[in-house]
């Protein structure tokens, strides 16, 4: 019996050659709409879909393949006499191969001028139905959704006259992933359209971007996936200009670094980061000086770190960065001379380019944190804060210079792992105390790191001080201004301690835990 293929594709790459090879192998081809036009134009004889269904394509193509003569030919089990007899009774011809890809819903909604009506019209109905029918009956039907699979299928058909069950099963799995992702993207779009904040079902669509050698440790398998609707300002969208491929830990650190620098939009800023904690942040009127400050913040920890800059990298800054070992440099752009300097004798240095003009869109994204058996979802910590809303709770008011330093410190502390403490002046970090299980230990680490640079320094805490001993440690170091959320039942004890030592203390009313 002559084998029958049904071909209906929106992506016509490679389809003419594939169909011609099928014809050469003796297959007959049923086709639809634009696909039939393309194949006919190439001189490939095809059967029109309406000759199979007995109905014309109608309603602007919305109804063309939803018919028993199509789905009966796809779903009929060849090993069941009742199914075979039903096909004979109703004059249904079995379909052995389905080649379908779907309306370009994703491509449509990514267009800047796409309307809601455009999106709706590009929701494919018949295509997923055929794919799912064929995939369900993969014991008998080969189903293809990806042009990359054409060559393998032709090789098997040429060698054996049919595809193997293993191949059909693998292709069926690919189809179910494809249709599930397609529907999930539609669901995501409609959820956003109606403004649903807490959907009872959560579907997320990601595409494999990079298979990884290993994960956080060599014994862990890992891969990197990118959102099906890419976020412009994200590590997943960064363009790599030089160096080895990014590792699992590189990606996490780079993601953390570009989150930090989002809060420093107004002035040239450089962030150095290690193990997802900032180890140096510098801000100045030019990017070279900002680099100097970030580097001087912690000369040791920056070694082998991640550096992100929010202005174009010039030759002078590149020369300084080239002088030390860095894992990754991220910037919106590089001068030709700077790029030449950074890549000289450093073929492994990962250099990434990331446009900084889409930061607000990235801030609107949800954060997803996996736990065993579940997923936590939250908004990002991007609350808009104004110093005008802060409260000075001590007798002593901060000086103008201290006010500037406190604003800088408060931006930086958001990205230090809790319990987080940071010591800064008005243009650079001086000491970072991250991730301790008691806050006073973080205070001691940050102060010890700042050492002899404490004159005029201020201190920020990501959450309230539970006891006044924190303030006592700070006072002993000579720091004269503190910024923290407040909110402890013992706030007054901390205020009294600050007053005792002539320290200005500001309450923001906003906590910035980071786990």
UniProtKB/Swiss-Prot annotation:
Q: Note whether Hydrolase occurs among the keywords.
A: yes
Identify one Gene Ontology CC term for this UniProt entry.
cytosol
State the superkingdom: Bacteria
**Example GO BP:** 'de novo' IMP biosynthetic process
GO molecular function terms listed in the Swiss-Prot or TrEMBL record: IMP cyclohydrolase activity; phosphoribosylaminoimidazolecarboxamide formyltransferase activity
Q: Which NCBIfam families match?
A: PRK00881.1, purH
Q: Which protein family is named in the record?
A: Belongs to the PurH family.
Name this protein carries in UniProt: Bifunctional purine biosynthesis protein PurH
Q: Which organism is it from?
A: Streptococcus mutans serotype c (strain ATCC 700610 / UA159)
């Amino acid at each position: 019996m002559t084998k029958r293929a049904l071909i209906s594709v929106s992506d016509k790459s490679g389809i003419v050659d594939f169909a011609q090879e099928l014809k050469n192998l003796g297959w007959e081809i049923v086709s639809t709409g634009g696909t039939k036009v393309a194949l006919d134009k190439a001189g490939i004889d095809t059967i029109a879909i309406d000759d199979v269904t007995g109905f014309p394509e109608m309603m602007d193509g919305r109804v063309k393949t939803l018919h028993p003569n199509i789905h009966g030919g796809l779903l009929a089990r060849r090993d069941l006499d009742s199914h075979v007899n039903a096909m004979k009774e109703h004059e249904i011809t079995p379909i052995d191969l389905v080649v379908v890809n779907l309306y370009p819903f994703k491509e449509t909604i990514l267009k800047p001028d796409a309307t809601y009506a455009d999106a709706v019209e590009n929701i494919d109905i018949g295509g997923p139905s055929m794919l799912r029918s064929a995939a369900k009956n993969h014991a008998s039907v080969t189903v293809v959704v990806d042009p990359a699979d054409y060559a393998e299928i032709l090789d098997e058909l040429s060698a054996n006259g049919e595809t193997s069950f293993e191949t059909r099963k693998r292709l069926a799995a690919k189809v179910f992933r494809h249709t599930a992702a397609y529907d999930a993207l539609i669901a995501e779009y409609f959820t956003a359209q109606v403004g649903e904040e807490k959907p009872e079902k959560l579907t997320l669509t990601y595409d494999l971007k990079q298979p990884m050698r290993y994960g956080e440790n060599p014994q862990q398998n890992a891969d990197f996936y990118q959102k099906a609707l890419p976020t412009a300002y994200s590590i997943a969208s960064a363009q790599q200009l030089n160096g080895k491929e990014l590792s699992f830990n590189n990606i996490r650190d780079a993601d953390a670094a570009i989150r930090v620098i989002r809060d420093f939009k107004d002035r040239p800023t450089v962030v150095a980061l290690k193990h997802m904690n900032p180890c140096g942040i510098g801000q100045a009127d030019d990017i070279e000086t900002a680099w100097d400050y970030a580097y001087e913040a912690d000369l040791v920890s920056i070694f082998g770190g991640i550096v992100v800059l929010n202005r174009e990298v010039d030759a002078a800054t590149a020369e300084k960065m080239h002088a030390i070992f860095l894992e990754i440099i991220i910037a919106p752009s590089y001068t030709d001379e700077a790029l030449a300097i950074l890549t000289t004798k450093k073929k492994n240095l990962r250099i990434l380019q990331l446009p900084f003009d889409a930061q607000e869109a990235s801030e609107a994204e949800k954060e997803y944190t996996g736990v065993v058996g579940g997923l936590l979802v939250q908004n990002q910590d991007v609350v808009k804060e104004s110093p005008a809303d802060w409260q000075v709770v001590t007798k002593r008011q901060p000086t103008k210079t201290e006010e500037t330093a406190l604003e800088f410190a408060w931006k930086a502390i958001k990205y230090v792992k809790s319990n987080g403490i940071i010591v800064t002046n008005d243009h650079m970090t001086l000491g970072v105390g991250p991730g301790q299980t008691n806050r006073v230990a973080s205070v001691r680490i940050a102060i010890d790191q700042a050492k002899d640079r404490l004159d005029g320094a201020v201190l920020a805490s990501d959450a309230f001080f539970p006891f006044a001993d924190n303030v006592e440690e700070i006072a002993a170091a000579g720091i004269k201004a503190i910024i923290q959320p407040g909110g402890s039942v013992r706030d007054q004890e901390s205020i009294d301690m600050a007053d005792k030592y002539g320290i200005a203390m500001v309450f923001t009313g906003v906590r910035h835990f980071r786990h």
